[in-house]
């Protein structure tokens, strides 16, 4: 922690320099002749605008905002231009017992700042109270924090977008590719060193070409909002690599700007759009980097703590901690709700972002008594003319009471389905009693999502995510190995449903390695042949490893970065994944617009889905209840497609066969009305199979243990 120096004499300015301005829009807004400043605070008594030199190091002026309208302090500074560096000092009561933590000695970041300059330098002066004082956070610290806080920068929003526009991929054709701005390019040989780990690095042709050729539709970036590195991590020589510690919801993190200019983000978006790829941002509106009552005063805490945060009703000194990080933003407050929706509209309208994934999204729908799908935030998103046009993805849980809300978000939202992850992992690991749940996961978990006109794509299916094992590690480790995090391997989940197949970590055993490769193919085939919206993680497509680390949040290192030096097995897996994605996009029956529920269509005499036992007959209730059942056929009859439109793949009939037994199971290929024969399109045991061989009805196909097959029904006229 840096020791603060004695504060310099306070700078001042003539009151006549600033005009009254307007209370809207919030933030610093240039009109060509000057800049309007507007800051919400319901409980402050005075606000000073602090002007700094171009380096953000010397405070030149303090100017009191002259007007207060509808809880907005505002003023207009003539002749101010883009590039102006500023911050705020906010006056008011320091009364933590009643939720107030005003301290004008602390320079504060504008919640609406569009760009930050400088890094946060940890110092005792950042805290509104005196560290080590007997009264703890009830004490009052008089040291100036300005030398240690990032400053705000007025931007020129003008940008020549040309013909750029949102890609607007339909949900049924959406395949999400989760990645990290820094992690995807740090080890890529084609990315120049000076732009590695930045938005410019993601624009490099070879990086985009890999993503485009893979066949995914949407790139989801881990948080790019300006964030704070935790003090305890810096002490250990680490950083908050993932960035789930936001401090400015309108500003990209300066570390991701190789050029130092906001235009770099816009150029990245345009490049991805040109490659026909959507840009989805992982956003963290559930908490801020200010932490609990013992945290620093950086922005909202010092602007109006009682308005921005949810506080304990019986003692407002303390924070409700539904985020698990120390504080929780209060989106039931109209001005906090406005800030979040303004931020979303800014990224969608000004930055051309195509969608958002909301971290711990249950918090965003919480009132004091719990989650409410009619929460003002959720309603606002559905009604907003901009936000209702972009993709909205919820991580539907948080750390508070009743936080698990999978399936309970309103229509218009897509939700991470952790039950898909857990069931599919358990099934391919060979756990008992998984068959019925596995069948449900393959068909978009209708028991959770088939309501109120929601579509199968509402279930966002994933095997792995940034949080947890990579796919390679999932089949290579029984236990986490987070020693590099320097937390005695106590961090990260112990419930991974992983299996190392006989040896912990890398091995030279060819049988184990072959089985691991097959299991990765099983996972990918399950993910990409299931109903719902699939998401894969960058590097999984070629078997990236994190060396058993399942919590790489602090690993801004080779552990956390994607390794582009592909092994032969990695190249083979990549080729297989590309085939699966192409098949998914070719056959609409794999991404139906309605849930398949086993309904019988009397007009054509078929069910939309039929569940088959290994003997080729329909599964009985008794067979569903058998705990040791691990083999299942899933017959998707294309004649039951709801549209009736005939186009290539639209009316294909497909049969998926899964066998999680360790031994071969003979599976009888079923008869289908109107005749035909079966062609094997995918066999995870023989990845080279491409439909070369035909099989008649009632043929007993020997399904290798721990493998998945995909058959297509063909007729003579199809050949």
Feature locations, PLM:
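Beta-sheet entry/capping signal
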Residues: 36-38, 174-175, 217-220, 276-278, ...
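Conserved, mostly hydrophobic/aromatic
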Residues: 39, 88, 179, 221, ...
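Short, flexible loop/turn elements at secondary-structure junctions
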Residues: 41, 67-69, 79-81, 92, ...
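A generic secondary-structure signal for well-formed alpha-helical elements
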Residues: 84, 92-94, 183-184, 188, ...
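Core domains of carbohydrate- and sulfate-ester-processing enzymes
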Residues: 90-160, 231-239, 245, 275, ...
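Conserved alpha/beta catalytic core and glycan-binding cleft of carbohydrate-active enzymes
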Residues: 352, 367, 373-538, 542-543, ...
């Amino acid at each position: 922690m840096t020791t603060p120096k004695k504060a310099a004499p306070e700078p001042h300015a003539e009151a006549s320099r600033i005009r009254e301005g307007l209370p809207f829009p919030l933030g610093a807004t240039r009109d060509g002749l000057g800049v309007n400043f507007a800051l919400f605070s319901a409980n402050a008594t005075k606000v000073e605008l602090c002007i700094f030199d171009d380096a953000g190091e010397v405070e030149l002026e303090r100017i009191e905002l002259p007007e207060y309208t509808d809880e907005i302090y505002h003023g207009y500074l003539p002749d101010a231009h883009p590039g102006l560096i500023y911050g705020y000092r906010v006056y008011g009561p320091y009364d933590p017992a009643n939720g107030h933590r005003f301290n004008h000695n602390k320079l504060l970041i504008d919640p609406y700042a569009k760009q930050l300059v400088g890094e946060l330098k940890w110092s005792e002066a950042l805290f509104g109270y005196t560290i080590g004082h007997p009264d703890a956070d009830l004490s009052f610290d008089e040291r100036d924090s300005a030398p240690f806080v990032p400053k705000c920068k007025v931007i020129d929003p003008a940008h020549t977008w040309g013909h750029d526009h949102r890609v607007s991929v339909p949900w049924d054709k959406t395949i999400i590719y989760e990645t990290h701005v820094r992690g995807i390019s740090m080890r890529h040989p084609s990315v120049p060193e000076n732009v590695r780990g930045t938005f410019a690095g993601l624009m490099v042709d070879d990086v985009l070409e890999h993503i485009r050729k893979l066949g995914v539709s949407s790139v989801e970036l881990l948080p790019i909002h300006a964030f704070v590195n935790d003090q305890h991590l810096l002490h250990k020589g680490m950083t908050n690599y993932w960035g789930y510690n936001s401090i400015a919801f309108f500003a990209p993190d300066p570390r991701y700007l190789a050029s130092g200019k906001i235009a770099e983000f816009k150029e990245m978006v345009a490049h991805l759009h040109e490659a026909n790829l959507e840009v989805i941002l992982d956003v963290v509106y559930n908490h801020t980097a200010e932490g609990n009552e013992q945290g620093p005063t950086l922005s909202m805490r010092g602007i109006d703590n009682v308005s921005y945060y949810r506080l304990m009703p019986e003692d407002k000194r303390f924070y409700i901690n539904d985020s698990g990080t120390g504080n929780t933003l209060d989106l039931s407050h109209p001005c906090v709700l406005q800030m979040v929706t303004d931020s979303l509209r800014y990224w969608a309208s000004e930055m051309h972002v195509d969608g958002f994934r909301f971290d711990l999204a249950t918090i965003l729908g919480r009132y004091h008594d719990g989650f409410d799908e009619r929460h003002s935030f959720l309603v606002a998103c559905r009604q907003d003319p901009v936000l209702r046009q972009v993709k909205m993805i919820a991580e539907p849980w948080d750390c508070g009471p009743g936080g698990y809300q999978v399936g309970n978000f309103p229509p218009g939202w897509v939700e991470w389905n952790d039950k898909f992850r857990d069931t599919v992992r358990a099934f391919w690991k060979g756990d008992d009693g998984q068959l019925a749940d596995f069948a449900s996961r393959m068909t978009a978990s209708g028991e959770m999502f088939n309501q109120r006109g929601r579509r199968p794509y509402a279930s966002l299916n994933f095997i792995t995510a940034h949080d947890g094992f990579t796919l390679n590690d999932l089949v290579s480790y029984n236990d986490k190995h987070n020693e590099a995090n320097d937390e005695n391997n106590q961090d990260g989940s112990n419930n991974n449903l992983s299996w190392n197949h006989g040896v912990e970590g890398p091995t030279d055993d060819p049988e184990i390695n072959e089985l691991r490769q097959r299991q990765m193919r099983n996972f990918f085939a399950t993910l990409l042949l299931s109903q719902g919206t699939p998401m894969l993680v960058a590097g999984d497509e070629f078997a990236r490893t994190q060396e058993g680390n399942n919590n790489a949040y602090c690993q801004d290192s080779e552990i956390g970065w994607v390794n582009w030096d592909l092994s032969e097995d990695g190249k083979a897996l990549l080729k297989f994944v590309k085939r699966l994605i192409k098949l998914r996009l070719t056959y609409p029956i794999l991404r139906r617009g309605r849930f398949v529920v086993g309904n019988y269509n009397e007009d054509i005499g078929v069910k939309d889905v039929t569940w088959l036992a290994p003997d080729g007959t329909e599964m009985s209730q008794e067979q569903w209840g058998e705990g040791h059942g691990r083999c299942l056929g899933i017959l998707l009859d294309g004649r039951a497609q709801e549209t009736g439109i005939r186009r290539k793949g639209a009316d294909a009939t497909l049969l998926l066969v899964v066998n999680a037994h360790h031994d071969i199971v003979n599976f009888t290929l079923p008869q289908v009305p109107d005749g035909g024969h079966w062609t094997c399109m995918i066999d995870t045991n023989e990845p080279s199979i491409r439909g070369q061989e035909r099989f008649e009805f009632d043929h007993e196909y020997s399904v290798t243990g721990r493998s998945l097959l995909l058959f297509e029904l063909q007729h003579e006229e199809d050949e």
